Regions:
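A secondary-structure boundary/capping signal
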Residues: 17, 110-111
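Short intrinsically disordered, low-complexity coil segments enriched in acidic
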Residues: 1-2, 116
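A short hydrophobic/small-residue beta-strand
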Residues: 106-108
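A broadly tuned preference for mixed-charge, low-complexity surface segments
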Residues: 10, 22, 135, 140-141
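N-terminal glycine-/serine-/threonine-rich beta1-alpha1-beta2 phosphate-ribose binding loop
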Residues: 2-103
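Rossmann-fold NAD(P)-binding glycine/threonine-rich loop
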Residues: 94-99, 112-140
Length: 141
């Protein structure tokens, strides 16, 4: 099979937080799907998302997504390759970040508190597990 016939790689995302930023992530990925595919040579698909209130109206389409109130369900989902953490704080968010990294899932976070207070631990855990930890926008990005 030559390059033109290969199916495009789909990177599956688990999203923690469906507030303003989380809903925007979904909208941007949906709206820019073709441009992202052309630029990256792969597709990104949010397959599961976590929110405190699943009944709250969202400013994005949640069609086809698995929805949960349990952030660990997102991290433990076997198909999730990248965890995007947008819940903030240093309690459950930190637990989720560490577990995601230890389960060999790449992580992107906008969690200023977790990076400020536990950045060295998170970076060290990511390095030991050969995992990408993205957080630039969380710190004066």
């Amino acid at each position: 099979m030559d390059e033109a016939q290969k199916p495009m790689q789909v990177i599956k995302i688990g999203l923690l937080g469906l507030g303003t930023v989380g809903a925007s992530v979904i909208r941007i990925l949906q709206k820019n799907k073709v441009a992202i595919e052309k630029k990256c040579g792969c597709s990104f698909e949010v397959i599961i998302a976590c929110a405190r209130d699943l009944e709250k109206p969202r400013d994005c389409s949640l069609d086809g997504l698995i929805l949960t109130t349990d952030p660990l369900e997102v991290v433990r989902h076997p198909e999730v390759e990248v965890v995007v953490e947008l819940i903030g704080g240093t309690t459950i968010a930190l637990e989720v970040l560490i577990e995601a990294i230890e389960k060999s899932k790449h992580v992107v976070t906008a969690n200023k508190a977790a990076i400020a207070l536990h950045g060295n631990e998170l970076i060290g855990t990511a390095k030991r597990n050969d995992i990408f930890l993205g957080f630039e926008a969380a710190i004066a990005g």
